From Swiss-Prot:
Pfam family, one: Ribosomal_L34e
Transmembrane segments: none
GO biological process: translation
The protein's name in its UniProt record: Large ribosomal subunit protein eL34
Length: 92
């Protein structure tokens, strides 16, 4: 019988076979949804779907791409944004 705190669907059930041959259920937090672009809403590549405690253990470069606005804006929107800003600075 699970503890009352584990009788919720907000936890993921993982079936694990123990060395003794029994199958037991481990309760883990669910993965969060993918990080999305702030402009177009497309899921971002290079940003892991991890809970904050596991994300904290990653190196800085494993958390998001190494480019301006990496982990916040997708490359397509970034290139469009840079083109617009350069054109605006040239015209004025």
């Amino acid at each position: 019988m699970p503890r009352p705190g584990l009788k919720t669907r907000s936890k993921r059930r993982v079936y694990v076979r123990t060395p003794g041959g029994k199958v037991v259920i481990h309760y883990e937090p669910r993965k969060p949804g993918p990080a999305r672009c702030a402009i177009c809403g497309k899921p971002l590549n290079g940003v892991p779907r991890l809970i904050p405690s596991k994300l904290r253990k990653l190196a800085k470069t494993e958390k998001r791409p190494e480019r301006p606005y990496g982990g916040y804006i997708c490359p397509r929107c970034l290139s469009r944004l840079l083109r617009e800003s350069i054109r605006a600075s040239i015209s004025s």
